[in-house]
């Protein structure tokens, strides 16, 4: 299995997006391509058809490659629970929650074997692999036990492209420093450089390309432009940004998302990028909230902690005032759990303290108990109270808590198997659910937004076909990258590497 690995001079230089583009480019050229990232650190998950959990970025890259995502594409996923600990997900299933020191000391050998197994499995079904690195390959304090960069390139025996972000400044120093800190055998793997996020006429950087090639001895395979029009999901919180409407504020739907410290699966909001009259802003204080057209209370990796923060900041009282004065709220997963009267950490799975309790926001008649085993599943269901033409919905669930309705209430959804989910209160102005990707359902999203539009005196808009838009985004990204990247030269380098290794 031939391949290429994309490494970067730092985090958030564009590795994920470039890997996504390469997956699409190579797939369009007839290759059977798989993405791969040995170890991902993110609270944004992708649930495979088997109900197993991988990093969202590799799920997106699999879609770009026109392949079904599998756990072998991301064998290790680390999900931060606080500043010191992270949950380890190995081959799609949670296995432990440990500190960084304990992880390095106790998990390295197991992680190495998982990576070898994943690469071997993928090689049986694919003829090309596009591997994404993490952070920088020259974190010298970590490199004795690294599992994400040059060690993976060695295991897969593939050449490396080094990506640098010119937008943040210091592109020459970052490239020079990275190459200088690599070991000689590692530097030999670097067959090309990509300068990313360039603004303006690339001819203005021609002397920069010459300097890099003359002084560093590595060819520049492309100078990629800044691509603000490409709507591909970011990997993690480093890429989290606001969604800006193309219309004036008084003609737009203003949605405020409560910016939780351990916010997870914020990709639930991605569909709004394709709605031209929707603006999304992340809000971390009551003063900044204002009077939005809707509030979204998203998921979190640390429900108790983030709920306590919301209460300390005065959001409990503010949300009560907002809901009782005709405001609209949608709460997803951890946000849904927060809506209730009380949360009980029976197993200590959220707080580490068995039996810990906390009062909720008291907006819905529900109570949540946290168990030991996490539920991860793709879900299908029906809306019991349709918005517009919406009826059937799909999504996925990732949660430790189980939520019970403790007073008469109206569930929002009926899942396959005749199980109910969520709450539907105040004639649909307050919805809580465990369904991630609720807004990926075109009819639901359209019906919900049109309700907000009518309420604001705006005209209704036709349904945006999300899947069609996403496919077009992958092709647009591939077109933009293929226009400036020397793809044929890259393929030649990959072929030659395979022949000589």
From Swiss-Prot:
InterPro entries tied to this protein: Class_I_gatase-like, CobQ_GATase1, CobQ_N, CobQ_synth, GATase_3, P-loop_NTPase
UniProt-listed Pfam families: AAA_26, GATase_3
GO biological process, one term: cobalamin biosynthetic process
Positions in coiled-coil regions: none
Domain spans labelled GATase cobBQ-type: 252-444
Record pathway: Cofactor biosynthesis; adenosylcobalamin biosynthesis
Residues the record marks as active site: 333, 436
Family: Belongs to the CobB/CobQ family. CobQ subfamily.
Alphabetized PANTHER family for the sequence: COBYRIC ACID SYNTHASE, DETHIOBIOTIN SYNTHETASE
Role of this protein: Catalyzes amidations at positions B, D, E, and G on adenosylcobyrinic A,C-diamide. NH(2) groups are provided by glutamine, and one molecule of ATP is hydrogenolyzed for each amidation.
Protein name according to UniProt: Cobyric acid synthase
């Amino acid at each position: 299995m031939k391949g290429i690995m994309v490494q970067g001079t730092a985090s958030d230089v564009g590795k994920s997006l470039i890997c996504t583009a390469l997956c699409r480019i190579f797939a369009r050229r007839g290759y059977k391509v798989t993405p791969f990232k040995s170890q991902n650190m993110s609270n944004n998950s992708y649930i495979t058809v088997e109900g197993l959990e991988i990093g969202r970025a590799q799920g997106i890259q699999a879609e770009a490659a026109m392949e079904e995502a599998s756990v072998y594409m991301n064998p290790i996923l680390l999900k931060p629970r606080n500043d010191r600990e992270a949950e380890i997900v190995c081959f799609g299933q949670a296995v432990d929650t440990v500190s960084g020191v304990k992880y390095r000391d106790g998990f390295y050998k197991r992680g190495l074997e998982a990576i070898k197994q994943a690469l071997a499995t993928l090689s049986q079904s694919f003829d090309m692999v596009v591997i994404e690195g993490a952070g920088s390959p020259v974190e010298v304090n970590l490199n004795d036990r690294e599992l994400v960069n040059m060690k993976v390139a060695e295991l897969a025996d593939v050449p490396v492209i080094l990506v640098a972000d010119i937008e943040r400044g210091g592109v020459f120093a970052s490239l020079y420093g990275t190459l200088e800190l690599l070991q000689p055998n590692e530097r030999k793997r670097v067959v090309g450089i990509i300068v990313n996020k360039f603004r303006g006429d690339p001819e203005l950087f021609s002397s920069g390309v010459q300097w890099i090639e003359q002084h560093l001895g590595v060819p520049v395979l492309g100078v990629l432009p800044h691509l603000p029009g490409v709507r591909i999901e970011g990997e993690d919180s480093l890429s989290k940004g606001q969604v800006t409407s193309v219309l004036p504020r008084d003609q737009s739907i203003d949605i405020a998302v409560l910016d939780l410290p351990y916010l997870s699966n914020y990709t639930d909001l991605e569909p709004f990028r394709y709605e031209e009259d929707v603006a999304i802003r992340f809000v971390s204080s009551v003063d900044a909230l204002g009077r939005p057209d809707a509030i979204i209370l998203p998921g979190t990796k640390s429900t108790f902690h983030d709920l306590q923060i919301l209460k300390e900041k005065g959001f409990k009282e503010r949300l009560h005032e907002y809901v009782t004065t005709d405001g609209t709220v949608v709460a997803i997963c951890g946000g849904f759990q927060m809506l209730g009267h009380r949360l009980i950490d029976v197993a200590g799975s959220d707080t580490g303290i068995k039996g810990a309790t906390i009062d909720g926001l008291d907006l819905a008649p529900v109570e949540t108990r946290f168990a030991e085993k996490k539920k991860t599943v793709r879900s299908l269901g029906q809306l019991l109270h349709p918005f517009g033409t919406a009826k059937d919905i799909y999504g996925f669930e990732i949660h430790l808590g189980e939520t019970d309705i403790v007073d008469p209430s109206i569930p929002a959804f009926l899942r396959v198997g005749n199980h109910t989910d969520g709450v539907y209160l105040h004639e649909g102005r307050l919805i809580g659910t465990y369904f991630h990707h609720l807004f990926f359902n075109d009819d639901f999203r359209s019906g919900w937004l049109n309700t907000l539009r009518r309420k604001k005196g705006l005209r209704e808009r036709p349904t945006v076909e999300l899947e069609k838009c996403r496919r077009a985004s992958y092709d647009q990204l591939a077109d933009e990258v293929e226009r400036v990247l020397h793809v044929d030269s890259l393929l030649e380098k990959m072929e030659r590497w395979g022949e000589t290794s």
